[in-house]
Amino acid sequence: MLVHPEAMSVGALADKIRKIENWPQKGILFHDITPVLQSAEYFRLLVDLLVYRYMDQKIDIVAGLDARGFIIGAALAYQLNVGFVPIRKKGKLPFETVSQSYALEYGEAAVEIHTDAVKLGSRVLLVDDLVATGGTMLAGLELIRKLGGEIVEAAAILEFTDLQGGKNIRASGAPLFTLLQNEGCMKG
């Protein structure tokens, strides 16, 4: 049973996100979505808000980014009655993969997807918990494109607007939807 999104405000989700100062390092205000996931009411609200947005968009598959994108994406795929594809950190998938690197603050990382995960022309929704600099999301989008998928949209719960990730994603040609926007995760 879907909860109509007007039944509760998106602001209620924002209130449920826990803020933790100086984690994972000094100067960062971490936004922890686990309280949303722990609450049946708020987890349902989160998924239902996304279901209502995408239920008429003819999505073939939902892809989720490691790791919180798995939780949201799999629940959303289930409700949309489509398959789910994990995009994992490099070295975690057992079958043949394609990889995409992205920049970190100090260095580089990579994500991978199975080569048979997205069929040519499939309409794909990419999901993660948040968008900061956009590096992971951009890498995921590039993987989907490499496999011939069509990006319906990239979606996240939260976007840190001051870090320009959303702007970078949109500049790549992918539409981006976020339920919440915040000025940033830098403390003080």
Swiss-Prot record:
EC number: 2.4.2.7
Catalysis: reaction(s): AMP + diphosphate = 5-phospho-alpha-D-ribose 1-diphosphate + adenine
GO molecular function, one term: AMP binding
Pathway(s): Purine metabolism; AMP biosynthesis via salvage pathway; AMP from adenine: step 1/1
Entry's family note: Belongs to the purine/pyrimidine phosphoribosyltransferase family.
Protein task: Catalyzes a salvage reaction resulting in the formation of AMP, that is energically less costly than de novo synthesis.
Protein name (database record): Adenine phosphoribosyltransferase
Species of provenance: Neisseria meningitidis serogroup A / serotype 4A (strain DSM 15465 / Z2491)
Biological classification of the source: Bacteria, Pseudomonadati, Pseudomonadota, Betaproteobacteria, Neisseriales
